[in-house]
Amino acid sequence: MSAWNALTYEGKDTILRVVREEAERMFAMAEAPGAWEAPTAAGDWQVRDVIGHIVDTTEGYFHSFEVARAGSSREVHGLPAMHELAGAGGRSFRGVPQSEMMSRVRTDLDKILDLLGGISEEEWGSFMAPHAYMGPVPPSIYAGGQLMDYGVHSWDIREGIGRAHAISADAADLLVPYMFIVWQYTIRASADLSPFTIGLTVTGRNAGSYRISISEQGMSYEPGDVSDLPTVLDFDAGGLVLTAFGRINGGNARGNLELADRFLNLFYRI
């Protein structure tokens, strides 16, 4: 298995290293003069709300693991509720001074990296902790969640600054395997799920081609040849990540463009 696929244990050290790197870059931006109340590309969030969101989310992760270790459960809200609840959670810290929030987010980062760093190979993909929005998921998903927060929201902060910029290749490459899971969890309740299959190719350290099938059961995917399919979407790693998160409309489509449009509009954006 690849050290760049953090859904496997072989990728654990890589993703935890990149989470730390992305976090430190975010912290530097958040502490820049005048940045705290600056706008971002995450809806109406300001930079301080991004930091608040990460504190709220990370401390929720601690609770999830405590609950799981105790053999208990917690309320699961479902991903459709995440936009509203996560936004409220992030904004709830607006009255807390910047210095206090930055100290708290750094402490939380150290704690979550220690927690995830101590997860065994056996538990990385099998120990189930109840995520507030996704339900029971393994530690590999929590690591991905940290990289999504620090990687994608760093992109949001840079986008808010208004200068040309790019998502880091390390973050994007690591997030590629998670994007198929994001799509599985974000299909609109009103979506037309009459069956079809399309192809998707992606470049980077997790380069490959995938067959994605839609049916009444939702979305499934598997690696495979896509040359026989009516539509193929081509992405680089950053384009796939930012498209799956609704930040851009990226990639290019080959073949039946109407089918490509139908697929890309199946999902609500988080």
Language-model segment annotations:
Residues 202-232:
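Acidic/His-leaning functional-site neighborhoods
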Residues 27-40, 110-142:
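Acidic interhelical loop/turn segments
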Residues 172-212:
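A glycine-rich beta-turn/hairpin centered on an aromatic-Pro dipeptide
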Residues 2, 36-80, 129-188:
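Short, contiguous alpha-helical
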Residues 1-13, 61-118, 122:
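Short, helix-capping/interhelical loops that line the mouth of catalytic, cofactor-
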Residues 22-25, 29, 57, 108-111, ...:
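Amphipathic, well-ordered alpha-helical segments in soluble domains
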Residues 1-40:
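Non-cleavable N-terminal signal-anchor transmembrane helices
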Residues 224-270:
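C-terminal interaction segments
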